[in-house]
């Protein structure tokens, strides 16, 4: 209900619109001044009418019900709104970016006061290295800047959709983002792959299984880490990919749906089946030796006590392996890219490769085709130069 307070010749009308996360009341107000010559009775009647009209405007959104709402105070509502729309790990990444970057830079501003200029300054500060999560002071890569910007854009779009602001100041048409430049996909050449596999023979059996499955299935690291022995069909030579592993700070390791929320079966070669059988037998020996100290369940990839590995373990183990063997450093995800590229180079159907990798859209798989086409153009130019040289010598 609206409250009316007389201030000199004017009347202040205030409408409560709830409380922010700190318990502070949120209020929208207006000032009404009577026309000269109005009687006291007319003024009383008119100010009540104005109060009723103003309250209706606040309630139906014509006037923002949270005109004083700050960005930092809106964020808890935003996070609740998008919960369920994005994955658990994405939500945690959003929280980290919001906590360490967005709130320190813009959280003090009222939603209605945020302009494209504020967003542009934020983007520029990320690009220049003024804002860093790790305090290094180095500029973020364009792709990283764009990811952080998308979070801010999403917050303000949510506020716009709820009619808390008249427009989204972070609209992509209003903000200049750093150019992406040419995007390259990390892929192992056949020679690099051969050298890596040779070094792999000296590693633990579990790590050998991990890397061979990564290459042969193209699975994401979280999907591999989440594998259980029940997912392996030794007779059909297939692996059932239905979940992914994730870890939130302060909480135990958990599983979730795959990135596309769909399961898939992936065929693997006979030698991988043999490796898996050897590792299963070795794991059984470890379990027997540990006895009651065994904490595992049915996981394929385990820690020393049998419990499941961390979702980040494949990356850390792979990085350590490359360093110890003085091999070129590439991300663990490069094995997935390599798997897709080798299949396409060998003539596999792109739709089949897309399904095998668990891509939601075939356009995602197309980036590997572009890489292959570029390599083919380079090869064509090399051959062309050779033939041209031969023709010149002949002349």
Q: What positions do the PLM features span?
A:
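Active-site/catalytic core of tyrosine-dependent DNA strand-transfer enzymes
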Residues: 190-194, 236, 244, 269-328
């Amino acid at each position: 209900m609206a409250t009316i307070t007389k201030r000199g010749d004017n009347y202040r009308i205030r409408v409560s619109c709830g409380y922010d996360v700190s318990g502070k009341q949120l209020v929208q107000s207006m000032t009404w001044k009577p026309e000269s010559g109005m009687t006291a009775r007319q003024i009383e009647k008119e100010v009540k009418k104005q109060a009723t009209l103003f309250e209706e405007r606040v309630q139906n959104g014509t006037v923002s019900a949270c005109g004083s709402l700050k960005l930092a105070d809106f964020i808890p509502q935003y996070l609740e709104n998008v919960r369920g729309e994005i994955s658990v790990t994405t939500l945690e990444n959003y929280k980290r970016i919001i906590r360490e970057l967005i709130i320190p830079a813009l959280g003090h501003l009222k939603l209605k006061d945020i302009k494209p200029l504020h967003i542009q300054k934020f983007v520029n500060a990320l690009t220049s290295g003024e804002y860093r999560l790790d305090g290094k002071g180095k500029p973020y890569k364009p792709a990283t800047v764009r990811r952080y910007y998308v979070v801010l854009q999403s917050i303000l779009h949510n506020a716009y959709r709820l009619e808390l602001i008249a427009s989204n100041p972070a609209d992509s048409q209003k903000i200049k983002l750093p150019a992406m430049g040419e995007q390259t996909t990390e892929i192992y050449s056949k020679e690099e792959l051969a050298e890596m596999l040779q070094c792999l023979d000296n590693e633990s059996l579990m790590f050998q299984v991990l890397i061979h499955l990564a290459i042969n299935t193209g699975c994401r690291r979280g999907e591999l880490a989440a594998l259980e022995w029940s997912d392996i069909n030794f007779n059909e030579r297939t692996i059932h990919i239905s979940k992914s592993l994730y870890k939130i700070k302060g909480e135990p390791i958990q599983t979730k749906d795959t990135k596309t929320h769909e399961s898939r079966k992936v065929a693997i070669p006979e030698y991988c089946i043999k490796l898996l059988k050897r590792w299963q037998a070795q794991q059984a020996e470890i379990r027997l030796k540990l006895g009651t100290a065994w904490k595992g369940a049915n996981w394929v990839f385990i820690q020393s006590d049998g419990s499941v590995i961390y979702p980040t373990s494949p990356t850390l183990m792979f990085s350590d392996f490359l360093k110890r063997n003085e091999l070129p450093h590439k991300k663990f995800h490069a094995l997935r890219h390599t798997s897709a590229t080798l299949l396409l180079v060998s003539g596999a159907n792109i739709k089949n490769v897309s399904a095998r990798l668990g891509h939601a859209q075939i356009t995602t798989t197309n980036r590997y085709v572009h890489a292959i086409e570029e390599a083919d153009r380079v090869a064509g130019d090399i051959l062309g130069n050779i033939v041209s040289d031969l023709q010149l010598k002949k002349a």
